[in-house]
Amino acid sequence: VADWPAVAAGRASDEAMADYLRGLDAGKPVAILHGEPEIGGRFFYTDDMSGLNFQRRNGPLGEALDRLLALKEHTAPSALAVQSTPTAAALPGFAQANPQPLLDASVGPRIWIGNAITTATHFDMNYNIACAVAGRRRFTLFPPDQLKTLYLGPLEFTPAGPPVSMVDIAAPDLERYPRFAEAWATAQVAELEPGDAIYIPYFWFHNVESLDPFTVLVNYWWSETPAVLSRPLEVLLHALASLRDLPPREREIWRGMFEHFVFQAHGDPVAHLPPERRGSLGEMTPEHLARIRAILLRALSQP
C-alpha cells in the first residue's frame, strides 16, 4: 500500500497525517480509549482483574487527533487510541482514495489510530490483512496450536472482544507462566514500516506494538465461510456451561459425539441416510437453521 495517498501523508509528518484524516472526517463519534501513563501503553486488566486499566468513551475523531499530537511533547504520555473504527462511517471516501486490490469491495477497511500502545496477544475469528499507514508497528505471531502455552484470560470479560493472553511478552513471568517458553520458541516477528502490510491467518495469535508517538493502521477482516448461526466462540461458551462439569465418562461420550458429527473424524456421519432425511446433520439449509435457532432459544430461555 506504499502508493496510498494516506501513506504519503503519514510519511510527510504526523501533522500532515492528522490533516489528511480531518479532511475525510464525517464528524461522527468514535470510540476513544485512554489509559494513564502508569500502564506503559498496554491496554489490559487492572492488577486484581476486577476491571480494565483504561477508560473507553465516545468522542470526536478530531479531538483524538489533536490530543495525540499534543501528547508527542510528553516524556511519559498517557495512552490514547481509536481502535477498529469502520472507515465507511467515520471517514467516507477513505476506501475509494486508498484502494486495496486483493479483496472483494464488500470487505471494508477499519482504522486504528494511537500513540505508542500495545494490544495484548489475542486471536481473531477472521482472516486479516493489516496495513501500516503512519508510524511503525511490531507484530509478534504465534500459531493456533500454542493455545495451551499462552495462558488465556477470561472468555467473556476481555479488554476488547476476543480473550487475551495474560503474558506480557515484553517482560514474561516464566515462573508464573512457564509454558510460555514453548510459545516463544514458535514466535514470528514482523516490524512494519509505513506502506507495509502483513497477512494474519485465521486464529493466529498476535501481539501488536505501536512503536511511534503517532501511528495509523488500516486492516481488513474477512471470513472464508461466514458463520451461519453464531460464532464458534459462543459455541465454546455453551459447551463450557453444559459439558465441562459432567462426570468424566459422560464428557468422553460427548467428545466422541463432537468428533463424529461436528469434526467428522470418521468421514461423513450420515452418508447412510437419504439426503432429504439427514436434517441438520446434512446440508445446513435456511429451514434447518431456523429450526436449530428455535430449539436453542427455547432451551436458553429455561430457568
Show where each model-derived region lies.
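N-terminal accessory scaffold of Fe(II)-dependent oxygenases
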Residues: V1-A197, F205-P303
